UniProtKB/Swiss-Prot annotation:
It is found in: Cytoplasm; Secreted; Host cell surface. Pfam families: Pyrophosphatase (PF00719). It comes from Mycobacterium tuberculosis (strain ATCC 25618 / H37Rv). This is Inorganic pyrophosphatase. Its main location: cytoplasm. It catalyses: diphosphate + H2O = 2 phosphate + H(+). Belongs to the PPase family. Other metal ions such as Mn(2+) and Zn(2+) can support activity, but at a much lower rate. Three metal ions appear to be required for the activation of the enzyme and the substrate during the catalytic cycle. Induction: Is constitutively expressed and is not up-regulated upon macrophage infection or by exposure to environmental stress when grown in vitro. GO terms for biological process: phosphate-containing compound metabolic process. CDD domains: pyrophosphatase. Mg(2+) 2 binds at E8, D57. InterPro entries: Pyrophosphatase, Pyrophosphatase_sf.
Length: 162
């Protein structure tokens, strides 16, 4: 499975950018309240609809951060199942598609445990200081479950429902 991910937030940023789906422009949504930075490039999978009514979120492991609005051809290796104040907010973990430097990463177990722990720590705590926001459940699942969620999100998008 391969798809395009639109990057909204480069790795290392505290600014939370979002693509305005009506205008196509990148908007500064907010600054993170916690003194933390995004641990990967972060965006969404084109032509999907997640459980939260937004396109399905994606995290892309890249050797160097890219800019907001850049499309990255990616493939899933796992998914971070997360529940926040709005409900399900899953994040598909991806690597660049067609890049031989990532051939050894095929499933979640191929990603170093420390990297997974760092990403999990960020998403469990990045909303800690924001009034009314929280994360209550979060864990990693494998590539098969990630691919199934991507497929469900594509079907929701095509049906226009969530």
């Amino acid at each position: 499975m391969q798809f395009d991910v639109t990057i909204e937030i480069p790795k290392g940023q505290r600014n939370k950018y979002e693509v305005d789906h009506e205008t196509g422009r990148v908007r500064l949504d907010r600054y993170l309240y916690t003194p933390m930075a995004y641990p990967t490039d972060y965006g969404f999978i084109e032509d999907t609809l997640g459980d939260d009514g937004d396109p399905l979120d994606a995290l892309v492991l890249l050797p160097q951060p890219v800019f907001p609005g850049v499309l990255v051809a990616a493939r899933p290796v796992g998914m971070f199942r997360m529940v926040d104040e709005h409900g399900g907010d899953d994040k598909v973990l991806c690597v660049p598609a067609g890049d031989p430097r990532w051939d050894h990463v095929q499933d979640i177990g191929d990603v170093p445990a420390f990297e997974l722990d760092a990403i999990k720590h960020f998403f469990v705590h990045y909303k800690d200081l924001e009034p009314g926001k929280f994360v209550k459940a979060a864990d990693w699942v494998d590539r098969a479950e990630a691919e199934a969620e991507v497929q469900r999100s594509v079907e929701r998008f095509k049906a226009g429902t969530h």
